Swiss-Prot record:
Chief location bin: cytoplasm
The name this protein goes by in its record: Transaldolase
GO molecular function: transaldolase activity
Coiled coil: none
Highest classification ranks of the organism: Bacteria, Pseudomonadati, Pseudomonadota, Betaproteobacteria, Burkholderiales
Active site positions, chain numbering: 125
Organism: Albidiferax ferrireducens (strain ATCC BAA-621 / DSM 15236 / T118)
GN (gene name): tal
PANTHER family in UniProt: TRANSALDOLASE
Length: 315
């Protein structure tokens, strides 16, 4: 048995790509997209027609609507391949606007429903800012399920649990990147690998807390830099993995054991916490890594959204 098949025994495997022609080979349950992945995909000849067809069909419509229609086109293609859910992201430029995020999410769902897609097959991705979490709480009450992304800290995870969101996406690789860069020449890779990886440790802390207190929100580890980070999180609810790393797992025959165990977490001595807005903002500010990576992640998604805008305008 290869490691990908072994991982599927413990964890729901999700494909992290907009390149849906790569997905089928790995038979994931779900798939995730984001503005950067869609931008990367539409620049490939195989997918250019999705962009030009969308613009041709809806020429004259507002640019933000064209963007949403393009995202839904990709999502529908992906859903024709996978049995589960696709995650589609609200424009990151709305990350600090609760009202606008809710409105865009509702439009995305309406567009999916117009294509015959049931609401339960879509997760709306929203950045895990205070405003994004508030938007997700409203959406969940309306029966629209959410995936809180750009999650780097324990306080974000707790606030998401309080909001009863469907799923969170803690970013393993970007946490690793920050600590590696911060350490500079003092970084020793083997001392920070596997279970000692700071990104892995962050997800483990969240996993243990959620399972200890019976929190229903799903945890989907994301943003992996190497296979070791993935195998160290075997047993996490879901892991979203790039095609490149899916291929490496598929090619590896080494044994793979469960690393995270919900039953074991229930016996841990942990204290329940909660955050109001002031407490959340203070805790996030105290975490330099999370503060910097959240801001950086939003900026990067905004840059790619603007590039997608330009491609739509030029089509």
């Amino acid at each position: 048995m290869n490691q990908l098949d072994a991982l599927k025994q413990f964890t729901t495997v999700v494909a992290d790509t907009g390149d849906f022609k790569q997905i089928e080979a790995y038979q994931p349950t779900d798939a995730t997209t984001n503005p950067s992945l869609i931008l990367k995909a539409v620049q490939k000849p195989d997918y250019r027609a999705l962009l030009t067809d969308t613009v041709a069909q809806f020429r004259g419509r507002p640019l933000d609507e064209l963007m949403d229609r393009l995202l839904v086109r990709f999502g529908c293609e992906i859903l024709s391949i996978i049995p589960g859910r696709v995650s589609t992201e609200v424009d990151a430029r709305l990350s600090f606007d609760t009202v606008a995020s809710v409105a865009r999410a509702e439009r995305l769902i309406e567009l999916y429903q117009g294509q015959g897609i049931h609401v339960d097959r879509v997760l709306i991705k929203v950045a895990a800012t205070w405003e994004g979490i508030a938007a997700a709480e409203q959406l969940e009450r309306r029966g629209i399920h959410t995936n809180l992304t750009l999650l780097f800290s324990f306080c974000q995870a707790v606030a998401c649990a309080q909001a009863k969101v469907q799923l969170i996406s803690p970013f393993v690789g970007r946490i690793y990147d920050w600590y590696k860069k911060s350490a500079g020449a003092a970084w020793v890779e083997q001392d920070n690998a596997g279970a000692h990886d700071p990104g892995v440790q962050s997800v483990r802390q969240i996993f243990n807390y959620y399972k200890k207190f019976g929190i229903a929100t799903e945890i989907m580890g994301a943003s992996f830099r190497n296979v070791g980070q993935i195998t160290a999180l075997a047993g996490c609810d879901l892991l979203t993995i790039s095609p490149e790393l899916l291929a490496q797992l598929s090619a590896c025959k080494a044994p793979l054991a469960r690393s995270l165990d919900a039953n074991a977490a229930q016996s841990l001595d942990l204290t329940a916490v909660n955050y109001d807005e002031a407490g959340f903002r203070f805790a996030l500010n105290e975490d330099a890594m999370a503060t910097e990576k959240l801001a950086e992640g939003i900026r990067a998604f905004c840059v790619d959204a603007a590039k997608l805008d330009q491609l739509l305008l030029a089509a």
